[in-house]
Design a protein with these regions (language model features):
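Charged, low-complexity intrinsically disordered terminal segments
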Residues: 1-254
């Protein structure tokens, strides 16, 4: 369960990398997911990360000599990692993206269980007039998460955020961006496992053209994604609400 290898990438010939949220298997072909192709020096960096992962032993030790994980940068693009018990830079990068926004924040995520500090940052931005938009999968493969996230969604909606639940089969994308063209794209969900426990990788890019494409895809999915309202929470059954509160207590471990 812990120290899970959750990063997803394909590195080709030391010059091309595909990264994002997609798993490999026939079962996943019907899921809505997002992946990014990057050419250049980052392809070589991901080859080095692949070698680095061979240093991961069964007891969770890393042979850090295989890779300098403190400087994973190509031009203005920066690769951030969550390395269990070592680095939590993806969370720091996401907090910066949220706090630096002036007009809008967009988040696509499979799981939406932000910790208290991150949820408060999103709520504060919404209350300050920043358009906070979150698209999450209404149903995941972990039903406890599906119940627990209702409280997080309810708090953000009450603060003025826009939250949508993807009603297709599964929405597995993981991407965040703001109005400055800052993008964080990769394998990490908004939950404790991705921020602290799994091995994850996310690419930080500054690209207004990419944010335009991501925003276009975001709004295209809203046709099948009901917007959440205060009534979406209050109109649920007593049993559903009770289960939500019980599951929320376990959210730091989900």
């Amino acid at each position: 369960i812990n120290n899970r290898l959750h990063t997803k990438f394909v590195a080709i010939d030391n010059r091309t990398v595909y990264l994002g949220g997609s798993n490999i298997g026939d079962y996943y072909t019907t899921w809505s997911d997002s992946n990014l192709r990057v050419d250049g020096e980052l392809g070589n960096i991901f080859h080095n990360i692949y070698d680095f992962l061979h240093g991961f032993s069964h007891d969770g030790n890393f042979a850090c000599r295989l890779l300098d994980i403190s400087n994973l940068q190509a031009g203005t693009d920066r690769l951030w990692l969550t390395v269990p018990r070592h680095q939590y830079h993806i969370r720091e990068a996401l907090m910066n993206l949220i706090n630096l926004a002036d007009k809008s924040i967009y988040i696509r995520t499979w799981y939406f269980l932000p910790d208290e500090e991150m949820l408060n940052a999103l709520c504060a931005q919404a209350q300050n007039g920043v358009q906070v938009n979150v698209l999450l999968s209404h149903v995941t493969r972990v039903r406890l998460v599906d119940f627990a996230n209702h409280i997080h969604v309810h708090k953000l909606v009450n603060a003025g955020g826009n939250v949508y639940r993807y009603a297709g089969k599964y929405m597995h994308s993981k991407a965040s961006w703001n109005d400055h063209g800052d993008v964080l794209f990769g394998s990490a969900n908004l939950d404790a496992h991705s921020m602290h426990i799994n091995f994850e990788s996310c690419l930080e890019i500054h690209d207004s053209n990419l944010t335009w494409e991501l925003r276009r895809a975001f709004y295209a999915d809203l046709s099948t994604s009901p917007k959440q309202t205060p009534e979406s929470y209050s109109n649920r059954s007593f049993a559903n609400k009770a289960l939500t509160h019980v599951c929320n207590l376990a959210s730091p471990w989900l």
